[in-house]
Amino acid sequence: DGPGVIRHIWITVDNKTSDGDCFVLRDLVLRMYWDDEENPSVETPLGDFFCCGFGQECIVNSSVIAVVPSRGLNSYFAMPFHKHARIVIENQHKNPIPAFFYQIDYCLYASLPANTSYFHAQWRRQALTEIGKDYVILDGIKGTGQYIGTYLGLSTLQRYWWGAVSYTHLTLPTKL
């Protein structure tokens, strides 16, 4: 119970439940609720929140997200709340997860400024985009705040490299 600010979240989890299984990080869903919200301000697969897309673990080194080789998932985003914070992990995986450990570091305060912004994160995927139609990255957020950034994972639906394009029809400038 708050007011307070979550300063650091550390999670480690087995990323496989068998040799042929590699989607634990995609199948664990992270939801965060601030104060009396009915709908989560954060709703994303656990791995994608920590910039490890497609259920694959990877190394990340940034000022707000760090994923270390020993599967330590770290978030340093400031996540303020006025009354209370609720963090939920839902297992949508086909098997039980044998190990899940976490630590949440936070500070409690007498009060927070009335204009304190809440932290939001959304996840979405789309198999095909449409030419001329904007791809929505963040939707339905009300109030003022700061846009911190986007983690974008890209994959191909084709068997071969998706970047192969013929440039023979293009005319290039002769001078720069």
Region spans (language model):
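An N-terminus-focused feature that recognizes amino-terminal "leader" regions
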Residues: D1-I65
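Solvent-exposed, flexible loop/coil segments flanking beta-strands in beta-rich domains
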Residues: D1-V24, N95-V165
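Residues that act as N-cap/strand-start positions at coil-to-secondary-structure junctions
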Residues: R26, I59, R71-L73, G163
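Short, surface-exposed beta-strand/loop "edge" segments at domain boundaries and coil↔beta transitions
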Residues: E38-S41, T129, R159-W161, T171
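Beta-sandwich interaction modules
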Residues: N61-K83
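Active-site scaffold segments
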Residues: R86
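Asparagine-centered strand-capping/turn motif at beta-strand->loop junctions
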Residues: I89-N91
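Conserved small/polar residues in nucleotide/adenosyl-binding loops
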Residues: T168-T174
